Amino acid sequence: KKNIYSILNKQFGFDSFRGEQEAIIKRTVVEQKHSLVLMPTGSGKSLCYQIPALYFDNCTIVISPLIALMQDQVDVLKKKNISAAFINSTISKPEKEKRLKEFVEGKIKLLYVTPERFRKTDFVEQIKKAKIDLLAVDEAHCISEWGHDFRPDYSRIGEFRELMGNPLTIALTATATHDIQEDI
């Protein structure tokens, strides 16, 4: 039977959780509650959505602001034999279509995209067909107009969530003042 501890150990090679990871992951997989996670850089925020992504039966969308960050995360996951991919402007149209099709078919467990990807009608039409259990919003401070690197499409994540059938959502950031937290 799948459990968060065996996923932590078998997929990621760790014997125990760090800091608040365990409580956050349990809130997601056991209580099935939305979360806003504030954890310092380097404290293992990514595991807080990656473990639930592997625990749940269906797929996870990860909204991330930086193409380089996406690529790094996907590379790390692939080295651990986890089916992950990204769709962004660095790849060809046929490759984007292939990855999107595989995601909709459930062959890709985690799909990393920028919020701007939701401007693309063909992407949105396909995403509506996918079975999505979890939406992870990385660098969630970008949602807030109070944030130093505000991205307008981040403020539309509520709309994007609806298109996906309102999946369980976890938003993560290392930097969020009280105003930014309220905004998110």
Describe these PLM feature segments.
Residues 50, 91-134, 143-148:
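Conserved helix/coil segment N-terminal to the catalytic DExD/H
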Residues 31-37, 58-60, 107-109, 167-168:
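Pre-Walker A (Motif I) flank of P-loop NTPase domains
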Residues 128-184:
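Post-DEXD/H (motif II) to motif III coupling segment of the RecA-like Helicase ATP-binding lobe
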Residues 1-40:
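Conserved pre-motif I regulatory segment
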Residues 30, 53-55, 77-79, 101-106, ...:
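Conserved catalytic network of the ASCE P-loop NTPase/AAA+ motor domain
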Residues 32-51, 61-66, 173:
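Walker A/P-loop
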Residues 58-80, 91, 95, 114-117, ...:
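Conserved Walker A/P-loop ATP-binding site and its immediately adjacent core
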